[in-house]
């Protein structure tokens, strides 16, 4: 006994089950029956706590698979097992699914059943073995061959044996049948049949002995044939299913037990032989098709039938066996796609879609739709690339490649979207169409037509109509079988649904590929044949490429990659555009929008026309601008970048950034980076110019330029960034610049030639300067050729002069002179003015304020640095954008002088900053046209990318930046505040940051005119090597990039401040440079911002918005930073004020960088953020601990802010304290210190603004905050963004402050003094959320449509101020985000990151929604 017990205990489930099945050799049992026997006979000790049934079932499942399995799963039945060695012939036969046997059985059984009302009894006895076998099979009983008919296994009861799924389907069928039968009974009297008794008997019998089950397989087989045909396939073609049903009498629509039992003849007599699969009266409407059609019922169907049905399933759901026959895959009929297809079919059935009348109508509609318009016929090619001279083989290869890539990239995006696309196509397509602009749309349409026709040709006639309807939508095809089925089903695709589907997929793939090519090539898209053929695309690319000479070689591959990678995104886009084509009415508007939104790819695509299309593009850009202006956010975004339509292009995304998009961009960036590096090496320094990433060339080009520029500036890193931006997304750099995620794209595209040139010029100038100065090393220049090439591409010819100039300037100064690299910005005339004047602090480079012409390139030699002459470019800047610049020019000159001096002492960057600080007045020069360049600066790009850019490289540029600052600020202020601004802001990246600073400043102006602070930190960030911008570029030049650039700048500035303060030597800042630099940085930022602001306030606003969206503290920090210069101004005391400011600056920048970092991290462009964090921390390592703590303590945003503040404070403590004294330090240490610093900076900026009202007004904070008032306002703003904003606006109104104020949100009581500001800062810290609001405020500025106007008339800053004030009020609420701690997701429109609460179900951020 003991042994036996032990044996029982040790027995496994497999052994126990085998024992049971050996005891009942010919009785297949379900797991439940086996368990019953085990329990009854005590074959295994079942412990409590386990689920014996589940264990046994799992074991049976496992051991019935594969060669070694000891059990055999009886086919066609749910979970019925027998021992493999015992598998009887009958079973095997059954498993063969030979329909005859099962049909015959069911028939014989049913005939027997029907023979008498006691059919169930008769069946049992009479049928003897067969019917019993069937019954048993269905009930899982063994064949009757076994003597014990009643119950071989004690546990088995006929009823029980049925598996649950079978029961389920039976139940469903039973119900449906009952309903139908009742209906029929009412309708007709069936005299011949004792229906009621029969029914009852049958039902009972079924219940009792699952006799009906056996039949069920048969009838189910039938129905599932017809039905599954009808339901499963129905999705494909109801008519087909109907025919099937009719053709298979057995398909009886009665897969119910009843029909099982009823005689075939009887069925026919009672008219139950056919299941209605057409009308809404069908019983199938109330049947669970999933219960009807499962692998068991399916296996009962005749083989031919199964094969035919399998063709309707997606490839993944069918497997081809060794014998070449298809088999169902395990989950084919049990997945969500099939379920939704079945559901969809049922719904369509209930809606009467399959009635002959409806089918006829649908067919007619399809026929109508099929007529190809002449113009489409003209573009038709029987295979992809035919018109481009590809041979069919090449075409196949190409499409195979693309489709593969496509497949990967596209799958996620395409699968669902596609289905929906059909419906949405008209809407979303319009966007993408917009991108391509009307030309592209037409082309695309033709392409689509071609694809469609191709598909149709391939498809069978029946499928054709369906396909036509489906295909245009291009929706169902790829997504999933069920969907496809559904889609096609309504259509009369009976015969070849699958082929049609696969063809469709193929076509779609081709289509996608072609789209990809188009998109990838960007220019090619518009290219001659809108070629679907890669060659054409390449050719287009070539067209573009020439511009980008160095990158070209790489570019082509990138194009291909991009094609592949971005196919997914593009696919959607192109489909959309195709749809848009269909809806011409929408096309124009959408096209504009699209252009704005998808500038990167589309813009480049547009470039395909090369020189010709640019003009048309420009108008569209203009339209978008006007369109954008009205919208606060878009306008704001556009405003800054208005001048640089390129920026619009920035988002190459059409509204939805897809993984493919991102990947493609990354690939492109990589390739471009390589190209840029080579080019940079070749062109050694002039490449930076192309930096017109923001406004630069057409969409893509700008981005590329930007990336290239940064690459040049930072050499390898920068180059990479550039490439990232440029290549990554044709408009990535632009994207970066563009405030408007999607809004600007069209503008960019079209304005590019004109406005973009300006913006690009600005950017380029600055970037070149920065690049140069940043590179200060020849190494930096390396990427410049690439940049210039990119720029050219970007501007597509529009900025070739820029390029040339850039290159020239680049060559001019390797050491610290950014020199005239900026000059190249000629195309960007106005922007250039600003950018051109960017002087390098170390070398006061020449900044060519080539307002309108490259000629403008004033090569301010290093002399500029030495003297104010450096600002000459500024003065020269005739650019419309830079009206203020010109005034600044004098200031800039002064600033330039100051900068130059320090520049000598301090190696590039910091020295400039100190000088700036020292000579606030001279700082004016620095403010230069920095604003324009930021996006393009390679350094900036690198920073954005999160690459480590030497601080020195970046810092020198700050001077240029200062130069860039608009003189609008009072000379004194400019000197006092502006200089610091220049140093911190304009020169802000005082050394290597120069480039970055410029770029950021431009960006700031463009993106965040109200973001002096960010610029500064950004400057620091650059040194930190933080260039998330590049990454962001691809994502959303406009928002993300702007934000990132600003952040980077802020970080850099912070770093500068920190570095100068903490380690002057490290920063290479003049000794006094620390404090001075800090303050100068702030001021410079302010100036730069002002100038920039004037140039592109909208961008700034957008940027801010992004920040607020990001819920970054950096925004507020930036604001604070901006304030810093003002505060300093307020302080007035160069020593004390600047010192304090320095500390503040540092704090702010750190804060900004950290928050930026965090935010960036959040963003997909998180790179910047991450990098910033990292950067910041190292720089602010001293400050890091408190900062981080603060960070932790504050929420995400507040934490960011706190961190920045703390870090800044710490740094400040380290340096500022040194320089300024313990007050700053204490503040820095305190959470309030941060706020105070912030406020201080704001105050200084305010002072700046007040002094240089005109000048400042364009600037974010500076302009907003007249002086201390402004600063004070800012402080409260930080605390209470809205109210302060209003106040600030009022106060700033005098200066242009309000205009920026909105952005800056410097509207607090004007009386607040530095002290109060500081308190405010503390408050800010405490109100980290408040800070967030402030950031939100920045966002508010985003909508600075007026700012645009303001920009245009930099001089009339008052107006801009008002506009800004209004804007800020408007945007204030939207910009505020109260969910700072929540998870961030990416906006599908511009790629900006925000909280999912903010973005909401539309997946669009506030600014995109406003734009839409």
Swiss-Prot record:
Its main location: nucleus. It is found in: Nucleus. The keyword tRNA processing does not apply. Residues 442-459, 504-521, 1166-1178 have a biased composition (Basic and acidic residues). A motif (LXXLL motif) lies at residues 309-313. Residues 11-86 form the HTH HARE-type domain. One of its GO terms (biological process) is animal organ morphogenesis. Residues 91-263, 385-621, 684-784, 814-834, 864-930, 971-998, 1125-1199, 1246-1289 are annotated as: Disordered. One of its GO terms (molecular function) is DNA binding. Pfam families: ASXH (PF13919), HARE-HTH (PF05066), PHD_3 (PF13922). A motif (Nuclear localization signal) lies at residues 181-185. A zinc finger (PHD-type) spans 1374-1411. It comes from the Eukaryota. Putative Polycomb group (PcG) protein. PcG proteins act by forming multiprotein complexes, which are required to maintain the transcriptionally repressive state of homeotic genes throughout development. PcG proteins are not required to initiate repression, but to maintain it during later stages of development. They probably act via methylation of histones, rendering chromatin heritably changed in its expressibility. heritably changed in its expressibility. Involved in transcriptional regulation mediated by ligand-bound nuclear hormone receptors. This is Putative Polycomb group protein ASXL2. The lineage of its organism: Eukaryota, Metazoa, Chordata, Craniata, Vertebrata.
